[in-house]
Amino acid sequence: MTSKATIIYTHTDEAPALATQSLLPIVQAFTRHAGIEVKTSDISLSGRILAAFPEHLTEAQRVPDALAELGELVKQPDANVIKLPNISASVPQLTAAIKELQAKGFAVPDYPADPQTDEEKAVRERYDRIKGSAVNPVLREGNSDRRAPKAVKNFAKKNPHSMGAWTKDSKTHVATMQSGDFFHNEQSVTVPDATSVSIVFTDKQGNKKELREPVALKAGEIIDATVMSKKALLTFLAEQVKDAKAKGVLFSLHMKATMMKVSDPIIFGHAVKVFFAPVFEKFGDKLAAAGVNVNNGFGNLLANLDKLDADTRAAVEAEIAAVYAANPDLAMVDSDKGITNLHVPSDVIVDASMPAMIRNSGRMWDKDGKAQDTKAVIPDSSYAGVYQATIDFCREHGAFDPTTMGTVPNVGLMAQAAEEYGSHNKTFEIEADGQVQVIDAAGNVLMQHDVEAGDIWRMCQTKDAPVKDWVQLAVNRARLSNTPAVFWLDENRPHDKSLLAKVNAYLAELDTNGLDIRVLAPEEAAKFSLGRLKNGEDTISVTGNVLRDYLTDLFPILELGTSAKMLSIVPLMNGGGMFETGAGGSAPKHVQQFLEENHLRWDSLGEFLALAVSFEHLAQKTGNTKAQVLADTLDAATEKLLLNDKSPKRKAGELDNRGSHFYLTLYWAQELAAQDKDAELKAAFAPLAETLTADEAKIVAELSAAQGKAADIGGYYAPDAAKAAQAMRPSATFNQALAKL
């Protein structure tokens, strides 16, 4: 036996955090017998808020900065981390979490919406570091290898999910800017030597201002800069509202306001103001005085209506009703509750919303809960064409058939906050007309843009080492799976041109003999891959960070019905491994149902898959043969779970997340008892397999009896640990059997 190995299991938010209360005790009971310790690390939104304000808390309330600790751990060669989805907090989510913590006696400060004093600005800065996708860039010290495991793919082929039919007369389409956006204004430079660059804004009077402290760059680093014109954006949005009305389709906006936490809420706010233009033309000043900020969505305006006097409020509500009557129908997030696509920025996330629409015959829901053709507005044109190509393909060829279609695994460049997903601290809403320049340490101007007040300017970085690692990973996956690999890069786009120079150089250093590796612009790559997909052929997509995110939702949702069933491996650059559980989010709607009905429909398949590859990685790194046996038997148990249809169902009274955990435990114990590679494990798990087999009906009945009534877990963002554990482990018989292991 080797000395005790450690796996870190992240404690996150919402549905996956609830599932952890049930699954983790099972995992810890099993791994103990293989000399593996599974520890938790709290990177939940509430945990990160508490860690940011130790001086506001009592000694007993303080928590370590688990995210910073984990950020260091992933750089160690023996790192082994299971990473569950966490909230990428929008401002409404952040403020709700703060309120909940304050109500529980944690004296964290309020979020300053409009900071005036230095102290308020300092508090706001700390909170802004927690906002948006604050976790993944810290932990992703490697590139991404995402694919559908064979067991999952085979199950989907035998048990196809529903796919909405497409007709040739579908009016659904993507609307994107033809000029003035990030794509059309991009400039790119590769710096030959290590340097630092300043980002300097000069106004029309010649006054200079550094927009942030200088950015350190490594040798060979690619930097890009670009700007979204506010004028061009507003013109585009107004045209699209008009066009949606003329075409009789729903108006919908698809952004990523969580990850792109600086740029996208601003764009979202402009869309709200354009759609509800008469409201802002007539009442803009009064709404601003009431604290309305529609960068947080139209819901923010509605939430602040009670701050207006009765007459003004009535007039605003009448104007809103008039806008709804005059404008195209908005796509709805929740028709029953009247929540539109423009209510909350974090409700409609492009990488999830577009595939869901495509799977649903290209339709979204209107105010009456009916599916309608839709105008999908994606203002920046960098990647919008990929979705248009997919829509065109479905319109021409009909919906995909999950029983015969191939698969599109992804190798994604994401290490060290590559590309747009690392741009937040270099993104600025411009205050006045002028010019922004990027100037190196020697005083050379590397890039410059003329800008106007309200424009959004940003800079991105892509380091050389991650690119080299990404190309190597792509070649490895192409060889191991004997599958063509396509780099989705556009040689006419400045950033992609810079990247291609590196890709070609690194490919030349590798053995690519007998491999089919090609480079296609994103729209062409989409058409090529979709054609193969329909014919049952597989194609690896090798992409940058944003397309990694988009495609690992798009293809899995079409192939498997969900992106939560993906194997998501991050081979860390220093030799460790991070195993992400699926590619979906943290499923707030699942929690809503759980609180109302005590039924959790979250599917932990992503966790099962990640655990198996985590054990396998540990076995390879440490020579722990028991870990390999755990991996093999867990894979077999997972396949059995799928074949026996023991995944969670949607309705209360049916099997839920807790029931699926029981069946996984039963099958895993049976597999361990049946195997002959490790006598100790066989002996340890035979009694458990026997007990669970005998008590199956009793345990399922106990789990089922808990459902159908409201669940109390003592909080949403910061549930009470004891209450949550009790709610998620309601079978005394099952708990006793595990305790004896």
Where are these regions (language model features)?
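C-terminal accessory extensions/subdomains outside the catalytic/core fold
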Residues: 719-741
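Internal hydrophobic scaffold segments of catalytic domains
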Residues: 687, 694-697
